[in-house]
From Swiss-Prot:
Underlying gene: CHS1
InterPro entries the record matches: Chalcone/stilbene_synt_C, Chalcone/stilbene_synt_N, Chalcone/stilbene_synthase_AS, Polyketide_synthase_type-III, Thiolase-like
Record organism: Gerbera hybrida
Keywords carried by this UniProt record: Acyltransferase, Flavonoid biosynthesis, Transferase
Single Gene Ontology MF annotation: naringenin-chalcone synthase activity
SUPFAM superfamilies named among the record's database cross-references: Thiolase-like
Family: Belongs to the thiolase-like superfamily. Chalcone/stilbene synthases family.
PANTHER family reported for this sequence: CHALCONE SYNTHASE, HYDROXYMETHYLGLUTARYL-COA SYNTHASE
Function text: The primary product of this enzyme is 4,2',4',6'-tetrahydroxychalcone (also termed naringenin-chalcone or chalcone) which can under specific conditions spontaneously isomerize into naringenin.
Positions of the catalytic residues: 167
UniProt-listed Enzyme Commission number(s): 2.3.1.74
One Pfam match: Chal_sti_synt_N
Annotated protein name in UniProt: Chalcone synthase 1
Amino acid sequence: MASSVDMKAIRDAQRAEGPATILAIGTATPANCVYQADYPDYYFRITKSEHMVDLKEKFKRMCDKSMIRKRYMHITEEYLKQNPNMCAYMAPSLDVRQDLVVVEVPKLGKEAAMKAIKEWGHPKSKITHLIFCTTSGVDMPGADYQLTKLLGLRPSVKRFMMYQQGCFAGGTVLRLAKDLAENNKGARVLVVCSEITAVTFRGPNDTHLDSLVGQALFGDGAAAVIVGSDPDLTTERPLFEMVSAAQTILPDSEGAIDGHLREVGLTFHLLKDVPGLISKNIEKALTTAFSPLGINDWNSIFWIAHPGGPAILDQVELKLGLKEEKLRATRHVLSEYGNMSSACVLFIIDEMRKKSSENGAGTTGEGLEWGVLFGFGPGLTVETVVLHSVPTTVTVAV
């Protein structure tokens, strides 16, 4: 007997009507703040490397050029003194690192998530999906499970755990959240990125300067967003709509950024030409993303770019002829927090919407209608998310 079930009607009923929308943002950092001007002296002292005078001078120059004013780090001097293997360049220390991050990564994520949930203004029971992302450690059950317990989310919340993706993953989680929100009517997706550099901290080595670059750039932080389609405008306040999302591997970029989890922790390897590879390919990604909208003036859109380092931002700016203010929010987050891997772009979204409101810009995107979010990371992998801002004058009905 033929079925009378209308599968198209079932599928249509499962889908949202409108685009995925960012509804709330929260951020968090550890309490321990490290100022970049003081960091070279601290770093070489705590790693017992003060005899490496020339290398210390190189590191000072790296820190001076980093455009970073301060960073936040969970690991303190006292902790490193208790765990000296973490201060060597290549000493077995994975157990110690893991013991720390499997506890602290979910805790820092909880802090950011609670802020996002508070801003959203709805009970946690309305969260239907959880995406958790970290490059800091691996465990089973994962950080997604731990956060579910810490927040008291429903046992039936649909979880997705992303480990070891690196710096492009802030775009990846938004792409996944967009698909979940738009294909599950009524879904409210909690997205959390939490990063702690305890997995990558190590002492200096004069034959591996790429490792030293990481020590000058990386910081700790967590960020969370609530994503959903068809917001209830009486109780929810849209911040940005996600129009499209894409991922690509850049040509001829294999080995440009690698990370390997070993007994010594997570080791990073960076080629010098990472800024060149990104700047050479970025216009193609922009053209692909914005040609459907008829946009080809890159100064007419707002920018949220992962701040991998100042050289990347400088070369992208130069290649595209961007005005200095285009990367203001990105450079501000780099200056005040360093490179927090996957969490960075979410911090930048938060910075942009706050400054747009403070400055009376008219929209959440610095007064502009359309914008781009870029994530860059291992692969080289690039995530491109097209955003549509909303008027800053929109208020929640009471």
